[in-house]
């Protein structure tokens, strides 16, 4: 831990420099060249060396080798792809399925621009954006839960 030099604000020389705008980072250690040339490369190279060292000394085998003769019937993607996977399963036309799948990120990008109000305002005072977000969350949960069910029960979630 370094020693920080505290400025004496009663010093007339310092007050004159501050009045001229020369007080920024006047006290302390400058970032150039001390940090940027010496400390940052050491940290970056040390991190890379630790990562490579761990990978060489202790390699981890991820999962088990694939067996093409023992593939499960229901192959599922990772859980965060379930809603989009469900869209592809339920839409009969491949083109419209892919179109709906690619429209998901574009739909998410439009939500902040639905209402022209201050973005730091209380979200409950933005009823359109809040309702679109809540409806989208419910639909995503519905599609995500339906993706783990067989195709016959996926749209009704097995309830109807």
Swiss-Prot record:
Topology within the bilayer: Multi-pass membrane protein
Entry's Gene Ontology BP terms: photosynthetic electron transport chain
UniProt entry keywords in alphabetical sequence: Chloroplast, Electron transport, Membrane, Photosynthesis, Plastid, Thylakoid, Transmembrane, Transmembrane helix, Transport
A Pfam family annotated for this UniProt entry: Cytochrom_B_C
Keyword 4Fe-4S on entry: no
UniProt cross-references to CDD domains, sorted A to Z: cytochrome_b_C (cd00290)
Residue stretches in coiled coil: none
GO terms assigned for molecular function: electron transporter, transferring electrons within cytochrome b6/f complex of photosystem II activity; electron transporter, transferring electrons within the cyclic electron transport pathway of photosynthesis activity; oxidoreductase activity
Location relative to the cell: Plastid, Chloroplast thylakoid membrane
Family, per entry: Belongs to the cytochrome b family. PetD subfamily.
Described purpose of this protein according to its UniProt entry: Component of the cytochrome b6-f complex, which mediates electron transfer between photosystem II (PSII) and photosystem I (PSI), cyclic electron flow around PSI, and state transitions.
Protein name as catalogued: Cytochrome b6-f complex subunit 4
Native species: Welwitschia mirabilis (Tree tumbo)
Gene: petD
């Amino acid at each position: 831990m370094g020693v920080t030099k505290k400025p004496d604000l009663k010093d007339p020389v310092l007050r004159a420099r501050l009045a001229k705008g020369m007080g920024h980072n006047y006290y302390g250690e400058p970032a150039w060249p001390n940090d940027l040339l010496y400390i940052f490369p050491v940290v970056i190279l040390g991190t890379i060396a630790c990562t490579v060292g761990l990978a060489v000394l202790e390699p981890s085998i991820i999962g088990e080798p694939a067996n093409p003769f023992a593939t499960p019937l229901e192959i599922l993607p990772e859980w965060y792809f379930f809603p989009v996977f469900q869209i592809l399963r339920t839409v009969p036309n491949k083109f419209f399925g892919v179109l709906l799948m690619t429209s998901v990120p574009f739909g998410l990008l439009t939500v902040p621009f639905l209402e022209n109000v201050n973005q730091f305002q209380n979200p409950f005072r933005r009823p359109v954006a809040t309702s679109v977000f809540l409806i989208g969350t419910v639909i995503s949960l519905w599609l995500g839960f339906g993706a783990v069910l067989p195709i016959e029960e996926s749209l009704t979630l097995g309830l109807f």
